[in-house]
């Protein structure tokens, strides 16, 4: 069976962003609140998103080089049952590498996923049914 690196099959729009929780000291939080009350930012979330985007911009070239070196698909990548059936008919297995969101559609059975997905590396989020995630657990890096 031939192993192939995945290329974009289909694009999706995320229904919701991933949420994160951070712990901040009271002084840091107070300084953020001060900037919000002084109208530098509309709210705490605006400040945090801006800070994250600024840091990502600072390290943008490093990220770009790492994406190319690791052969990652950048953005949103969805795998439907039809996509994976085509992979099975071709006798291939996917080595999924995504920076962003990898989504295995609800119509993908555990058997089809196991037969067609060799490994999954996701820097970001993986959306799949609980059963598919459990079946692929040893292949998720």
What residues fall within each predicted segment?
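Short amphipathic alpha-helix starts
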Residues: 17-34
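Short, basic amphipathic alpha-helical segments that act as recognition/interaction helices
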Residues: 3, 7-13, 30-34, 42-66
């Amino acid at each position: 069976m031939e192993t192939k690196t995945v290329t974009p099959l289909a694009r999706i729009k995320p229904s919701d962003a991933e949420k994160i929780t951070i712990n901040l000291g009271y002084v840091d939080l107070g300084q953020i609140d001060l900037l919000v009350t002084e109208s530098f930012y509309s709210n705490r979330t605006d400040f945090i998103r801006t800070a994250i985007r600024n840091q990502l911009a600072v390290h943008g070239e490093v990220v770009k080089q790492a994406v190319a070196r690791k052969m990652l698909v950048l953005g949103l990548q969805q795998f439907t049952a039809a996509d994976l059936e085509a992979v099975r008919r071709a006798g291939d297995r996917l080595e999924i590498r995504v920076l962003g969101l990898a989504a295995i559609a609800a119509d993908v059975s555990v058997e089809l996923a196991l037969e067609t997905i060799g490994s999954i590396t996701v820097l970001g989020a993986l959306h799949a049914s609980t059963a598919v995630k459990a079946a692929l657990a040893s292949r998720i890096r």
